[in-house]
Amino acid sequence: MSTTGRHHPLYVAQTRVFVSSSRYGTKDISAITIEVNMYENIGLPYITGRLIIIDSANASNAVHFQGQERVTIIVLDSEANPIMNKEFICVGIDFSQKVGDDKSGFSVKLIEEHVLLSNSTRFSKVYEGKPDAICNQICSEQLGVSVTPEGSPTQSDMRVVFPFTTSPLEAANWMAARCTNANGIPFYFYSTMDDNNLQLKDISNLLGQGAFNADDPYIFGTTSNKGAGQEEDWDILSKKITNYTINNNEDTLLAMARNVFGGYYNFIDTYEYGGEEIKYQLTDPLETLPKPNGSTTYNYDPAFTTGRPYHEGQNTYTSQVVTRKLFDDKFSFLEEDTVDKHLNKSKSRAIYAFMDQQPINVTVPGISFGFDKLGQQMDVYIQKDIPPEEKSNIESVRDKKRSGTYLVQKVMYTIFNNRLTATVTATKTSTDPSLGAEQLNQN
C-alpha cells in the first residue's frame, strides 16, 4: 500500500504487508496490496483476514501462494509508530480475475495460526480442574496459545475425558460453554487484535463496564460545523458514523425457537433423585445482569401477554440424562449435585442467544476506534428523522431507542488507500427510561 503523510483522523501513515515461507525469504507485497480486511467476532476464538492484491509485479509467481504462507500486517501511525502488528497464515485464494492486459487481481484468505494447528490435530487426554482452567490448559498444550480468564465460573472441579476424534479448539469450546457464573450467565470465548492470548470473559463483567467513549459518543446525524470551503472539523470526523444499518433483529419467533424466553427441562439423574422437571424463565437471569441508565429490564417486556407472558410459556421440552458419581472423587463433564445448577446450562444458552436480539452496524473511523475495543461498551448517538419545519435541539432529535450504550460484538477493519475504517456490529445494553413516554408525531 502507498504511504501517506497526512496527519488526519481517518488515515494511517503506512500499511506494510509481508509474506514469508520456508520456500523463500520474506517478501514485501505492500505496493500491490490495495485492500486489507480483518474480522473479529466475540463468539469465535480466532480472527480472520483477507488481502486484495492487484498483481502487476509477478507476485503470483514470485510469492506463489499455496495456502501455507505466513503473512504479517503492520499498521503505522503518522509518527511511524506501529499501532497494529498481526500475523496470520494464508489458507488459500478464493478468487482470481484478470483486470487488464498486464495485471490480475486476487483475494487471499487469512486466519490465525492456532486454528490451522487445531484443524490438523486430534488428541485424546484426561483433564481435571475447573472448566476455565481446562480450557486454558488445552489451548496452551495443544495450540501454544494461553487463555486469559475474567470472572470465576461457579462449576466445581471436574474430570473430562476427550476422545481421539476431538480437535483442541472443539474441546476448548466445550469447556468455555460449560462456564457460567452463579446466576447462570455465560462466558464469551474469543480472540482479539490487541492480545495474543485468547479471552474468556463473564458477560456480566462486560455489561458492567462503562463505555470507553462515555459522554463523547459516536454520532450519526448532522454533526458538521464547517463553513463554506472549509474541511470538516477533525474532532467531529473522529467520531462520525459514516454508515448505519439495522439487520434483521428482535425476532420473537427465532428467540422462541432458541428457548430464549422460557423452556421446560427434565434432568434425569441416574444416581439419586431420578427425573426432575423444571421450568426456565428469562426473567430470572435478566434480573441479575447489570442495568445502566436507570433501566429496570433489558429489551424484554415481562408483562406483555396475548394470553400469558412469553417467559411463562414453554417452547420445547428438553430431557437430559445426567450421571452422578461417574467418578468417585470428582464430577464428570455434565454432572452437578442439584437441579438448580443443571438449570444454569439452560440460562447460559438463552442469555447467549438473547445477546443477538438487537444488533446494529455502524461504520466509524478506525484511528479513533483502535484495535482493542472488542468486548467493550461504546456510546452511540443516533439522530431521528424530524419534519424540516419542526424546531429542534440535540436532545429532541435524539433517537431514544437506538441511541445509548452498546456492547461491541464484531468488528471488520478495512484499510483501503491507507484509510482505516471499523464496521462495528454491536448490541444495545441500555434502555432510556423515558422511552415509554414518547408520542407519535401526528403532524
Which residue stretches match the model-derived regions?
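Juxtamembrane "anchor/assembly" segments of surface/extracellular structural proteins
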Residues: M1-I74, F106-L117, E150, T306-N443
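Short, cationic low-complexity segments
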Residues: D77, P131-Q137, E141, G221-L237, ...
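Charged, gly/pro-rich, cysteine-poor intrinsically disordered low-complexity regions
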Residues: N225-L374
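Short beta-strand-centered interaction patches in the first periplasmic/extracellular domains
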Residues: G105, E112-H114, G151-A257, I268, ...
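Active-site-proximal structural scaffolding
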Residues: P131, F164-P168, A182, S191-M193, ...
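Short amphipathic beta-strand/extended segments with alternating polar/hydrophobic composition
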Residues: R23-E35, I83-V91, T121, G210-S224
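Surface-exposed cap/loop segments at beta↔alpha junctions
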Residues: A59-E150, R159-V161, A176, D202-S204, ...
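A broad structural signal for short, well-ordered beta-strand segments within beta-sheet-rich domains
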Residues: V12, T26-N37, C90-G92, D157-R159, ...
